[in-house]
Protein backbone atom coordinates (compact mmCIF):
# COMPACT_ATOMS: atom_id res chain seq x y z
CA UNK A 1 0.00 0.00 0.00
CA UNK A 2 1.54 3.31 -1.12
CA UNK A 3 1.49 6.15 1.34
CA UNK A 4 0.36 9.61 0.19
CA UNK A 5 3.46 11.22 1.67
CA UNK A 6 5.80 9.08 -0.39
CA UNK A 7 4.10 10.07 -3.66
CA UNK A 8 4.55 13.75 -2.77
CA UNK A 9 8.25 13.20 -2.03
CA UNK A 10 8.69 11.39 -5.33
CA UNK A 11 6.98 14.21 -7.22
CA UNK A 12 9.16 16.83 -5.48
CA UNK A 13 12.36 14.92 -6.24
CA UNK A 14 11.54 14.79 -9.94
CA UNK A 15 11.01 18.52 -10.36
CA UNK A 16 14.70 19.74 -10.16
CA UNK A 17 16.02 17.27 -12.79
CA UNK A 18 13.31 18.45 -15.17
CA UNK A 19 14.42 22.07 -14.70
CA UNK A 20 18.11 21.28 -15.26
CA UNK A 21 17.30 19.19 -18.31
CA UNK A 22 15.33 22.08 -19.79
CA UNK A 23 18.22 24.47 -19.12
CA UNK A 24 20.75 22.12 -20.69
CA UNK A 25 18.53 21.57 -23.73
CA UNK A 26 18.16 25.33 -24.23
CA UNK A 27 21.91 26.04 -23.89
CA UNK A 28 23.05 23.08 -25.99
CA UNK A 29 22.24 24.53 -29.45
CA UNK A 30 23.92 27.84 -28.53
CA UNK A 31 27.15 26.09 -27.52
CA UNK A 32 27.14 23.95 -30.65
CA UNK A 33 26.45 26.99 -32.78
CA UNK A 34 29.31 28.99 -31.18
CA UNK A 35 31.76 26.11 -31.47
CA UNK A 36 30.95 25.38 -35.10
CA UNK A 37 30.92 29.01 -36.35
CA UNK A 38 34.22 29.91 -38.10
CA UNK A 39 36.14 33.06 -37.09
CA UNK A 40 35.75 36.04 -39.36
CA UNK A 41 38.90 36.93 -41.33
CA UNK A 42 38.78 40.60 -40.30
CA UNK A 43 38.74 39.96 -36.53
CA UNK A 44 42.53 39.44 -36.28
CA UNK A 45 44.45 42.59 -35.18
CA UNK A 46 46.47 44.26 -37.90
CA UNK A 47 49.64 43.98 -35.81
CA UNK A 48 49.48 40.17 -36.04
CA UNK A 49 48.54 39.93 -39.71
CA UNK A 50 51.31 38.47 -41.87
CA UNK A 51 52.23 39.58 -45.35
CA UNK A 52 50.83 37.56 -48.26
CA UNK A 53 53.28 35.06 -49.71
CA UNK A 54 55.03 35.87 -52.95
CA UNK A 55 55.77 33.38 -55.74
CA UNK A 56 59.06 32.27 -54.22
CA UNK A 57 57.49 31.65 -50.81
CA UNK A 58 54.68 29.62 -52.40
CA UNK A 59 57.20 27.47 -54.26
CA UNK A 60 59.67 27.12 -51.38
CA UNK A 61 57.06 26.17 -48.76
CA UNK A 62 56.97 22.58 -50.03
CA UNK A 63 60.61 22.49 -51.15
CA UNK A 64 61.85 23.66 -47.74
CA UNK A 65 59.97 20.93 -45.93
CA UNK A 66 61.33 18.29 -48.29
CA UNK A 67 64.93 19.53 -48.01
CA UNK A 68 64.70 19.71 -44.21
CA UNK A 69 63.57 16.09 -44.08
CA UNK A 70 66.44 15.01 -46.33
CA UNK A 71 69.03 17.05 -44.38
CA UNK A 72 67.88 17.28 -40.73
CA UNK A 73 71.19 18.79 -39.55
CA UNK A 74 71.27 21.56 -42.15
CA UNK A 75 70.77 25.10 -40.82
CA UNK A 76 67.76 27.09 -41.97
CA UNK A 77 69.93 29.81 -43.50
CA UNK A 78 71.74 27.24 -45.65
CA UNK A 79 68.42 25.81 -46.79
CA UNK A 80 67.21 29.28 -47.79
CA UNK A 81 70.43 29.89 -49.72
CA UNK A 82 70.05 26.68 -51.70
CA UNK A 83 66.37 27.27 -52.39
CA UNK A 84 67.16 30.75 -53.70
CA UNK A 85 69.77 29.33 -56.07
CA UNK A 86 67.30 26.71 -57.33
CA UNK A 87 64.57 29.33 -57.83
CA UNK A 88 66.82 31.38 -60.08
CA UNK A 89 67.44 28.36 -62.30
CA UNK A 90 63.72 27.92 -63.06
CA UNK A 91 62.37 29.36 -66.32
CA UNK A 92 59.25 31.49 -66.67
CA UNK A 93 56.98 28.56 -67.57
CA UNK A 94 57.94 26.73 -64.40
CA UNK A 95 57.41 29.85 -62.28
CA UNK A 96 54.04 30.79 -63.80
CA UNK A 97 51.77 28.60 -61.60
CA UNK A 98 53.41 29.91 -58.44
CA UNK A 99 53.11 33.50 -59.66
CA UNK A 100 49.38 33.01 -60.30
CA UNK A 101 48.90 31.49 -56.86
CA UNK A 102 50.72 34.43 -55.26
CA UNK A 103 48.42 36.89 -57.07
CA UNK A 104 45.36 35.04 -55.81
CA UNK A 105 46.65 35.08 -52.23
CA UNK A 106 47.41 38.78 -52.47
CA UNK A 107 43.90 39.60 -53.74
CA UNK A 108 42.30 37.61 -50.93
CA UNK A 109 44.58 39.26 -48.37
CA UNK A 110 43.60 42.70 -49.67
CA UNK A 111 39.93 41.80 -49.48
CA UNK A 112 40.17 40.44 -45.93
CA UNK A 113 42.40 43.25 -44.58
CA UNK A 114 41.84 46.43 -46.63
CA UNK A 115 43.56 48.66 -44.02
CA UNK A 116 46.69 46.53 -43.78
CA UNK A 117 50.05 48.26 -44.20
CA UNK A 118 53.38 46.53 -44.02
CA UNK A 119 55.44 47.91 -41.12
CA UNK A 120 58.81 46.19 -40.81
CA UNK A 121 60.22 45.87 -37.32
CA UNK A 122 63.52 47.60 -36.72
CA UNK A 123 66.18 45.78 -34.79
CA UNK A 124 67.28 47.41 -31.57
CA UNK A 125 70.82 48.75 -31.75
CA UNK A 126 73.11 47.26 -29.19
CA UNK A 127 74.77 49.82 -26.96
CA UNK A 128 78.57 49.92 -26.57
CA UNK A 129 80.46 48.36 -23.72
CA UNK A 130 81.24 51.74 -22.14
CA UNK A 131 82.04 55.39 -22.84
CA UNK A 132 85.30 56.12 -24.60
CA UNK A 133 88.16 58.04 -23.09
CA UNK A 134 87.62 60.91 -25.49
CA UNK A 135 84.09 61.31 -24.19
CA UNK A 136 85.39 61.44 -20.63
CA UNK A 137 87.91 64.09 -21.62
CA UNK A 138 85.23 66.22 -23.20
CA UNK A 139 83.12 65.84 -20.08
CA UNK A 140 85.99 66.99 -17.86
CA UNK A 141 86.66 69.93 -20.14
CA UNK A 142 83.01 70.99 -20.05
CA UNK A 143 82.91 70.71 -16.27
CA UNK A 144 86.07 72.75 -15.88
CA UNK A 145 88.24 69.87 -14.63
CA UNK A 146 91.75 69.01 -15.81
CA UNK A 147 92.41 66.86 -18.83
CA UNK A 148 95.24 64.84 -17.27
CA UNK A 149 94.96 62.05 -14.76
CA UNK A 150 94.25 62.39 -11.05
CA UNK A 151 97.87 61.63 -10.11
CA UNK A 152 99.15 64.97 -11.48
CA UNK A 153 99.57 67.66 -8.81
CA UNK A 154 99.94 71.27 -9.89
CA UNK A 155 101.86 73.91 -7.99
CA UNK A 156 99.92 76.88 -9.35
CA UNK A 157 96.34 76.70 -8.07
CA UNK A 158 95.21 79.60 -10.25
CA UNK A 159 96.10 78.06 -13.61
CA UNK A 160 97.49 74.62 -13.00
CA UNK A 161 100.11 75.11 -15.74
CA UNK A 162 103.02 76.39 -13.62
CA UNK A 163 106.46 74.90 -13.40
CA UNK A 164 106.62 71.79 -11.26
CA UNK A 165 109.86 71.65 -9.23
CA UNK A 166 111.74 68.36 -9.20
CA UNK A 167 111.06 66.21 -6.20
CA UNK A 168 113.91 65.55 -3.80
CA UNK A 169 114.21 62.32 -1.88
CA UNK A 170 116.91 61.31 0.57
CA UNK A 171 118.37 57.88 -0.08
CA UNK A 172 120.98 56.11 2.06
CA UNK A 173 124.09 55.21 0.09
CA UNK A 174 126.35 52.49 1.49
CA UNK A 175 129.94 53.51 2.11
CA UNK A 176 129.14 57.17 2.68
CA UNK A 177 129.71 57.03 6.46
CA UNK A 178 126.04 57.42 7.27
CA UNK A 179 125.68 60.66 5.41
CA UNK A 180 122.56 61.31 3.42
CA UNK A 181 122.64 62.70 -0.07
CA UNK A 182 119.97 64.41 -2.08
CA UNK A 183 118.98 62.52 -5.17
CA UNK A 184 117.50 64.63 -7.94
CA UNK A 185 114.58 63.05 -9.75
CA UNK A 186 113.49 64.56 -13.03
CA UNK A 187 109.76 64.85 -13.54
CA UNK A 188 108.33 62.18 -15.78
CA UNK A 189 106.95 63.33 -19.14
CA UNK A 190 103.60 61.74 -18.31
CA UNK A 191 103.10 64.20 -15.44
CA UNK A 192 103.39 67.28 -17.66
CA UNK A 193 100.08 68.96 -18.39
CA UNK A 194 98.52 68.85 -21.82
CA UNK A 195 97.63 71.90 -23.80
CA UNK A 196 94.19 73.26 -23.17
CA UNK A 197 92.49 74.62 -26.33
CA UNK A 198 90.68 77.22 -24.21
CA UNK A 199 93.99 78.87 -23.22
CA UNK A 200 95.71 78.88 -26.61
CA UNK A 201 95.10 82.59 -27.09
CA UNK A 202 96.36 83.53 -23.63
CA UNK A 203 99.99 84.33 -22.84
CA UNK A 204 101.48 82.33 -20.02
CA UNK A 205 104.01 84.08 -17.75
CA UNK A 206 107.65 83.30 -18.31
CA UNK A 207 109.54 81.56 -15.54
CA UNK A 208 113.21 81.77 -14.65
CA UNK A 209 115.34 78.92 -13.42
CA UNK A 210 113.96 77.37 -10.30
CA UNK A 211 115.84 78.08 -7.09
CA UNK A 212 115.29 76.18 -3.87
CA UNK A 213 114.00 78.13 -0.90
CA UNK A 214 116.74 80.07 0.94
CA UNK A 215 119.12 80.40 -2.01
CA UNK A 216 120.43 83.89 -2.88
CA UNK A 217 118.78 85.81 -5.67
CA UNK A 218 120.93 85.82 -8.81
CA UNK A 219 122.40 89.15 -9.87
CA UNK A 220 120.78 90.66 -12.95
CA UNK A 221 122.87 93.42 -14.58
CA UNK A 222 120.98 96.65 -15.29
CA UNK A 223 120.06 97.61 -18.78
CA UNK A 224 122.36 99.83 -20.83
CA UNK A 225 121.68 103.52 -20.33
CA UNK A 226 119.91 103.13 -16.99
CA UNK A 227 121.52 104.86 -13.96
CA UNK A 228 122.94 102.53 -11.35
CA UNK A 229 121.73 103.04 -7.80
CA UNK A 230 124.45 104.22 -5.39
CA UNK A 231 123.70 101.77 -2.62
CA UNK A 232 127.36 100.94 -1.89
CA UNK A 233 128.17 104.47 -0.72
UniProtKB/Swiss-Prot annotation:
Stored CDD domains: HMG-box_SoxA_SoxB_SoxG
Region (Required to promote HAND1 transcriptional activator activity): 1-47
Any one GO biological process: trophoblast giant cell differentiation
Stated name of the protein: Transcription factor SOX-15
Modified residues (Phosphoserine): 37
Organism (species): Homo sapiens
Matching SMART domains: HMG
UniProt-recorded Gene Ontology molecular function terms: chromatin binding; DNA binding; DNA-binding transcription activator activity, RNA polymerase II-specific; DNA-binding transcription factor activity; DNA-binding transcription factor activity, RNA polymerase II-specific; RNA polymerase II cis-regulatory region sequence-specific DNA binding
Disordered: region residues: 1-48, 113-153, 208-233
Source taxonomy: Eukaryota, Metazoa, Chordata, Craniata, Vertebrata
Residue ranges, compositional bias (Polar residues): 1-11
Assigned keywords, A-Z: Activator, DNA-binding, Nucleus, Phosphoprotein, Repressor, Transcription, Transcription regulation
Role noted for this protein: Transcription factor that binds to DNA at the 5'-AACAATG-3' consensus sequence. Acts as a transcriptional activator and repressor. Binds synergistically with POU5F1 (OCT3/4) to gene promoters. Binds to the FOXK1 promoter and recruits FHL3, resulting in transcriptional activation of FOXK1 which leads to myoblast proliferation. Acts as an inhibitor of myoblast differentiation via transcriptional repression which leads to down-regulation of the muscle-specific genes MYOD and MYOG. Involved in trophoblast giant cell differentiation via enhancement of HAND1 transcriptional activity.
Gene (UniProt): SOX15
Quaternary structure and interacting proteins, as annotated: Interacts with HAND1; the interaction enhances HAND1-induced differentiation of trophoblast giant cells. Interacts with POU5F1 (OCT3/4); binds synergistically with POU5F1 to DNA. Interacts with FHL3; the interaction recruits the transcriptional coactivator FHL3 to the FOXK1 promoter.
Amino acid sequence: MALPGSSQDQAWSLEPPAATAAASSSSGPQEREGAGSPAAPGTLPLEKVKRPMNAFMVWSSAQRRQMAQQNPKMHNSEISKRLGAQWKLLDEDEKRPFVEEAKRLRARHLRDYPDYKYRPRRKAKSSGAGPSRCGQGRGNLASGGPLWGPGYATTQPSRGFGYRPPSYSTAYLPGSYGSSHCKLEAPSPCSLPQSDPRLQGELLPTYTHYLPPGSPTPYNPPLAGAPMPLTHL
